[in-house]
Amino acid sequence: MTDLTKLPVTVITGFLGSGKTTLIRHLMQNPGGKRLAVIVNEFGDVGVDGDILKSCAIPECPAENILELANGCICCTVADDFIPTIEALMALSPRPEHILIETSGLALPKPLLKAFDWPDIRSRITVDGVIALADAEAVAAGRFAPNIDAVEAQRAADDSLDHETPLSEVFEDQISCADLILLTKPDLAGEDGIARAKDIIA
C-alpha cells in the first residue's frame, strides 16, 4: 500500500455485550497478512476492552497500534478525539493497512460515518464496511441489548453523550448503516429466537 492509497476502515458496532471485542480479537489473530490498527471507543476509568485487545497483540497488530478513545461516545467527540486519533495512526511507521473501529454500544453510526468526509482525512481514509453485531436472544425478546441495566449505566457514565436516543432507535441506526449484520450467541436464542430476530431485523 502506498501513502497515496486510501486506508480502508471497518466500523464494528453493536450494544454492550453483543460480541464486538470478541470479533475484533478474532480479526486481530487472523489478519490475512495485513498490518492492522484498532480504535476502541469506550469511556470510564478502566479501559477493559482496550486491555483485552492489547493482551492479544501480535506482530501484525502490535499494542501501539491499539488506541482507545475513552472520553465518550465516538459520535459525540469526533473533532476532539476521532480525527486526531486517525491522524496519529496514519503517522505510524510502518503504516497500518487496515483500521478496525469498535464503537461504544451507544454510538450512532451515521454521525461517525459523516466524519470520514472531514477535509483533514477524507482524501486519506475510506469506509470499507460497517458490521453490526446483534445479540440474537435480546433482539428476539425485543430488548435489543443483552443487558439493559449495563447499557443504561454506560449512558449515565458518559458526560459527553449528546443524545438521549431510545435503544430501539440506536439499534435501528446500527442496522440501517450496516453492510453486514451478525447475529451473535445463537445457542442462547435457539432456532425460534433466531427466526424472530431475523424477522425483526428484516
Regions found by a protein language model. Name each.
Residues 102-104, 133-138, 178-196:
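G-domain G4 guanine-recognition motif of GTPases
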